[in-house]
């Protein structure tokens, strides 16, 4: 199980990672098991596109509906390609566009009941609601999706693993600590989207009020670069071929600091490291 024709590096100016071109468009009849594109990642909006070729979903929709549609189109995609939206938790940077996309394109929204109660005053009526239970695998066509609990200051936040034909993607952002459950679910992934929110020194010495710094550092806050490095040290395995660092703070982190710190846990000959950013889409990564 390995990524194919994937560029190393995010294309971010000043970030010292090798780059290679990525020009092949999305294929409806794929030669891969899963494809992923992070449309946006950060405190101003999060959305991730995942597709098996026959089934395509959004995990969170934290930008406006118009902006998500624009970013999909920049990759040769459309909301009309989507089969569903998954919601990890109710914070605005994860749900801003959920309601309008669901209504406009008749998309079901998969969400747990506690998150639904907290989110729906903001997102309004949707096309269809599909409640999932945390810890129970469910199917969207050929995608097997497993939501698992994470520690964050929301009603019932979750991470996800997505499996198709033996290939697994893991998504874990917006978590203050790494629990045994998180490790268990992420240790079998071929591609991992992992939070690296802040550099600890930048956070402590930065402009945030002390109360906000404490919240970010808390057990229900966000993972630091160092915490992400420690997690990868503990869960590395032969199948893990690609890590994408996500939800970087634009105030308390830089892509280069995240790469330099987290990269210490990875063998660059075996695992590709990329960074997702706020202002532009990632490449469309394919995994066989």
Segments and roles (model prediction):
Residues 22, 113-166:
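Metallo-beta-lactamase
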Residues 10-75, 158-173, 191:
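Conserved beta-strand hairpin/beta-sheet module of binuclear metal-dependent hydrolase folds
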Residues 180-277:
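Cap/insert and terminal regions of metallo-dependent hydrolase folds
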Residues 65-111:
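Active-site metal-binding motif and surrounding structural segment of the metallo-beta-lactamase
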Residues 2-23, 256-288:
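C-terminal regulatory/interaction regions
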Residues 91-95, 117-119, 154-155, 178-180, ...:
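Active-site environment of divalent metal-dependent phosphoester hydrolases
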Residues 59-62, 82-90, 110-113, 170-173, ...:
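Active-site neighborhood of phospho(di)ester-bond hydrolases with catalytic His/Asp-centered motifs
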Residues 96-105, 119-121, 253-260:
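Metal-dependent catalytic neighborhoods of phosphoester/phosphodiester hydrolases
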